[in-house]
């Protein structure tokens, strides 16, 4: 299916068209490549992207990354890994282990050049990869279960996987409703 410029603007009303135009083709290619191709999948994916990236404003986590220093659960085993492998991409890929897994998947050396995830192709493709495989499960399967009556439960479960908790749930809920209306 894919998302149009006007649909993306309805989902992310604060994103200027210049930003939408910068990412739209990359976003559609990534969604197609990773099977994010139904209304439900697109809506849940774009809601997470909208929140995590502040409507495509950020492709790199604003925080320093110090809170990830020494986090073995993220594979951060070398001094400086916390800052080096802080969240990047539209769905913040975080930690040496996740960067390494994405490198093995895509073939781009994002371990040596983490900033590749800040570029349009890296930001969109890594987000789609994380949503469908990189998080350890395919969140499209959860999105497929959204029948309109269980939307809140599906949203909460997807958010827990993407975020590790329910941070920003109200925002994600608004984006999801906009996406469902726009698509």
Predicted features along the sequence, with ranges:
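Acidic helix/loop microenvironments that form the catalytic cleft of cell-wall polysaccharide enzymes
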Residues: 49-52, 141-168
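Extracellular low-complexity, O-glycosylation-prone Ser/Thr/Pro/Gly-rich "stalks"
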Residues: 160-183
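Conserved aromatic-histidine-acidic binding/catalytic patches
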Residues: 15, 33-37, 81, 115-118, ...
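Secretory-pathway/luminal and periplasmic proteins that interact with or process carbohydrate-rich
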Residues: 17, 34, 51-61, 137, ...
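Peptidoglycan-targeting cell-wall enzymes and recognition modules
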Residues: 2-21, 26, 45-132
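Surface-exposed patches in mature extracellular/periplasmic domains of secreted proteins
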Residues: 35-45, 58-62, 138-154
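Amphipathic alpha-helical segments within well-ordered protein domains
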Residues: 9, 28-32, 128, 159, ...
């Amino acid at each position: 299916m894919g998302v149009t410029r006007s649909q993306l603007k309805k989902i992310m009303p604060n994103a200027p068209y210049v930003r939408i135009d910068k990412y739209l083709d990359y976003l559609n290619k990534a969604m197609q490549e990773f099977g994010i191709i139904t209304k439900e999948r697109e809506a849940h994916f774009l809601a997470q992207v909208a929140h995590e990236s502040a409507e495509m404003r950020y492709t790199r986590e604003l925080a320093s990354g110090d809170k990830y220093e020494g986090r073995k659960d993220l594979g951060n085993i070398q001094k400086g890994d916390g800052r080096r492998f802080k969240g990047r991409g539209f769905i913040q890929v975080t930690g040496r282990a996740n960067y390494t897994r994405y490198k093995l998947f895509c073939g781009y050396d994002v371990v040596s050049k983490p900033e590749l995830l800040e570029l349009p192709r890296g930001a969109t493709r890594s987000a789609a990869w994380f949503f469908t495989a990189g998080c350890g499960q395919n969140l499209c399967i959860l999105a497929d279960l959204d029948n309109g009556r269980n939307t809140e439960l599906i949203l909460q479960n997807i958010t827990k996987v993407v975020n590790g908790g329910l941070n920003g749930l109200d925002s994600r809920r608004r984006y999801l409703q906009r996406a469902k209306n726009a698509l």
